[in-house]
Amino acid sequence: VKRYRAKPIEIEALLWQGDMADLPQEWLTHVVTYEGDTGVLFTKTLQGPAAAEPGQHYLIANLDENEVYPVVVSVFERRYEAVA
């Protein structure tokens, strides 16, 4: 058995606050549904639609895979740090 480490990659991400105006234009094609009354956003991912709740999820853009997907805040903050 060998040990492996994930390769470092840079991503684009934002903490979803429920406002469509915050989304970069190129991410809009990944939106399946937006529930304006709750601010919940559903994005199209390789595994199917995924929900992002305001203040509970970051949205991450993996444009190499042509996808934008939500990640729970606690998981995001464990895995990522800001770059210059």
Mark where each language-model region is:
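N-terminal domain-onset segments
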Residues: 1-47
